[in-house]
Amino acid sequence: MRHALGSARRAGAALVAALTWAALLAGCSSVGSGGLDLDRILGKPPAPEDAIRITPDDGGRDVRPGTRLRVQVPGGHLEKVRVTRSQDAQDYPVPGRISADGLTWKPDHERLALAARYTVDAVALDSHGRRSARHTTFTTLVPDERFIAYVTPENRSVVGTGMIVSLSFSREIADRAAVERAVHVTARPPVDVRPHWFGASRLDFRPQRYWKPGTEVSVELRLRDVQGAPGVYGLQYKRFGFTVGRSQVSLVDAAKHTMEVRRDGELLATVPVTAGAPKHPTYNGKMVVMDMLEVTRMNSRTVGFGGEYDIPDVPHAMKLTGSGTYLHGNYWAPDAPGRVNVSHGCVGLRDVKGGSSGTPAGWFFDRSLIGDVVEVVNSKDKTVAPDNGLGGWNLNWQEWTAGSAVD
């Protein structure tokens, strides 16, 4: 599903009500195949690219530094804009301002940085008072004959015990062994941390078991002048680190419509949930919270479902896979959690429009960290792929260590 705004770094039975929710196959942004008209209930939102226009385009690569960065709306006004530049595992806010008429945001300094990833999160109100959110990313030009690594997690962050160190390279790596030898991941207290390649442009690191709470992890990139491919050399020589916070592992039972939340091994709560409907089941397996968004737009077209739904203000969204699985608040099917699975593959918790810390979704969001583990069992789908998000915990240790390029 489509995610947008407010990255928070700190994540079958027939139902009879005013509406027949059993007719609703509510996707990661629940909408129905049985005739339920969410457009009528929620108000028809404009298409994401029409409601909030962002340049450079979402997903852009090798964007040149002279390209103009703008956030614009055709009507109504921009409510909030946050732009972040990420380099060497460090996030830097990009200062800027919204124009007096509320229609345009532009940065204080026009020139984009080289070899950086930019993230744009924007929220706007249209002329009818409907709120929309949009999230886009793009990467800027890396000089010819150089490569860099985009790093997860963020430097100096506090993360959950399931965090996997993930390096995404700007160019395909031919000499994987040379690059692997140039990356050093160490922990205090000491633990064996091993690498695994997913294709030619991604290298992940993890221990055999989840990190112990309190572990301090250091990552050193000694990539400068390392030849990753013929004539292509590394640009970075950086060190960054993160700290593992408390342990929180949540078990979603899709058949029971429940989620058990365990903090440091003790049961904290059992929360009612709604998982993927029979036609769109939720992945089984271990998933790691990759991002946390206070509000997001979820649009079925972004994940191959056609025009089945488009909800502009999904609250408390926690990204679990790169393909678009989220755990999020659900205010449009309030009777579903604990009773029936109605989504297009996400896990939904009861919430209210606009989100509230007093709802199950808000309660869970406020107690979660990026890097927390959410495991799904008893769904009708396959196990999530290990390279879909931070899914590497679904490989056993022998499978994981076999992914090293160094003998």
Spans of model-derived segments:
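Exported/periplasmic cell-wall-interacting domains
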Residues: 161, 300-407
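Soluble periplasmic/extracytoplasmic beta-strand elements of cell-envelope proteins
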Residues: 53, 70-72, 119, 166-168, ...
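Gly/Pro-biased beta-strand-loop elements
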Residues: 231-338
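Short, charged beta-turn/beta-strand-edge "cap" motif at the junction between a beta-strand
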Residues: 124-126, 223-225, 265, 295, ...
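Acidic, low-complexity Ser/Thr/Gly/Pro-rich repeat segments typical of extracellular/periplasmic
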Residues: 2-25, 29-246, 273, 404
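Extracytoplasmic/periplasmic, Sec-exported soluble proteins
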Residues: 61, 110-113, 157, 161, ...
